[in-house]
Regions:
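Short, flexible turn/loop "capping" segments at secondary-structure junctions
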Residues: 36, 40, 94-97, 154-159
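Single conserved hydrophobic/aromatic residue that forms the stacking wall/gate
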Residues: 1-13
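Short, well-ordered beta-strand elements within core beta-sheets of diverse protein domains
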Residues: 43-53, 100-108, 163-167
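Conserved small-domain helix->loop->beta segment predominantly found in fold-type I
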Residues: 63-121, 127, 148-153
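Beta-strand segments within the central parallel beta-sheet cores of soluble alpha/beta enzyme folds
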Residues: 24-28, 77-82, 162
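Glycine-rich beta-alpha junction loops
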Residues: 50, 65, 82-86, 107-109, ...
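PLP-dependent enzyme catalytic core of the Aspartate aminotransferase-like
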Residues: 54, 111, 118, 134-191
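Conserved core segment of the aminotransferase class I/II
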Residues: 14-73, 117-120
């Protein structure tokens, strides 16, 4: 998603000094045509030129969003390695310069999730579109739809869990949108 800044169609892998691996890749390319087309290569190069700027904005927003969510009474839990409350915070500090642009958080239940998602205006509901927009996904009906409830809950994927991949929109706009959507959740809880 972050390489392209568009809806490009490839992945980048780099592995050196492994002739067996190189032979396998060469065979795959020969048989399946695994080489990106000219336009896909151009999109990748274009995306890499602005990746630093896009990541700075996404990370800055993700940090502020995670802090806001952690303080909000309608949110049960926030999973973001850039928060001091995260169990992996110290390791993350040693390994990375930020907590990244993806976080998850938990609301009370599926009803709260639906009220929240319905009220949102900015994030797109999807698994991934490969663009620069913020994307909200609901693992229960998306990535983990085929996983039995008992197994999914063992993995921490509850009926109230949402995943937010933060895009490059204005931080204040994202915070305002998320806050107003959480207010709708609180209204629903009070009823």
């Amino acid at each position: 998603r972050h390489y392209y800044a568009s809806r490009g169609l490839g992945d980048v892998y780099k592995r050196q000094d492994d002739p067996v691996w190189h032979e396998q890749i060469f065979l795959q390319q020969k048989v399946l045509g695994g080489i990106l087309g000219v336009e896909d290569c151009w999109l990748t190069m274009r995306g890499l030129k602005t990746m630093g700027l896009r990541m700075e904005q996404s990370v800055r927003s993700a940090e502020k969003i995670s802090q806001m969510l952690e303080q909000h009474p309608a949110v049960k839990k926030v999973n973001y390695p850039g928060l001091k409350s995260h169990p992996g915070y110290e390791i993350q500090k040693q390994q990375a310069s930020s907590g990244g642009a993806v976080l998850s958080f938990e609301l009370a239940d599926q009803e709260a999730v639906f009220a929240f998602a319905e009220a949102l205006k900015i994030p797109i509901a999807a698994v991934s579109l490969g663009g620069v927009e913020s994307i909200l996904s609901y693992p229960v009906t998306m990535s983990h739809a085929c996983v039995p409830k008992e197994e999914r809950e063992k993995q921490g994927v509850t009926d109230g869990l949402l995943r937010l991949s933060v895009g490059i929109e204005d931080t204040a706009d994202l915070l305002a949108d998320l806050t107003q959507a959480l207010a709708k959740v609180e209204e629903k809880i009070e009823k």
